[in-house]
Amino acid sequence: MEIDFSPENFTNQDYALRLVDWMDLEAQAIKRKFHKGLAVFAICALLCFIPLLFTGPSFAWENGPLEIAQNVVLFFETCLFLYFYKNAKGSRYQRLWGSVAILFLILLGRELSWGRVFFFKEMAPYGPAFYSLKEISYGFLVNWVVEALMLLTLFGLFRYAPWRAIWKEIPKPWILMALVVIRAVLSSLGDKEKILHTVFDQTIEEYAELLMYILIGFGAYWYYCWIRWMENRK
């Protein structure tokens, strides 16, 4: 909805009232788009699970289709928040978006086993095996780099996130949070083969993990939209 805020069109009181109306409309639009996106995600997640019933164990192996999909999602989310960081010049929250980008980068590094997946060793009964970090030339640096990135991320989140607004003003995405917890539980149970007690549990684990990463990205984008809305309101 476009509103002409030219001073000659109405008084200061009218301006304030219409600005409030416009911000309320924008807030409603954020909620609508988010809930619509979440509904589309749920339908697609269910439809995509059906073909997985006919796949073999190799589909969930390291460097398999599900693992690659996880890496693509995390890479996209990292790039998305780097883009937000770049375009937030002059904003007090610019470094917050940079911290979120680093968080997704850490998750991506974890899924890539810190680069181990690029050093194939042999094919084992459970799938491809890779050299350990101790056997890779840069392995001794990994822990130091990861810890530094984690500290940088935690500092950025605690220092630059508007925690008061997050707790008191910004709506909580309760449905999304519940879905993330459910996916995390399924991933953990699947890893221990405690769902169906078959090798298909590995596929459930990897698929649940993929959905969890997508939902975390949804959540990060939810707060990005609301913090931007909060900035515009002020």
Protein language model features and the residues they cover:
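Alpha-helical transmembrane segments
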Residues: K33-F49, A178-R183
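Juxtamembrane "helix-exit" motif on the non-cytosolic side of transmembrane helices
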Residues: F49-F59, Y160-P162, S188-T198
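Membrane-proximal helix-loop-helix units in multi-pass membrane proteins
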Residues: R110-W167
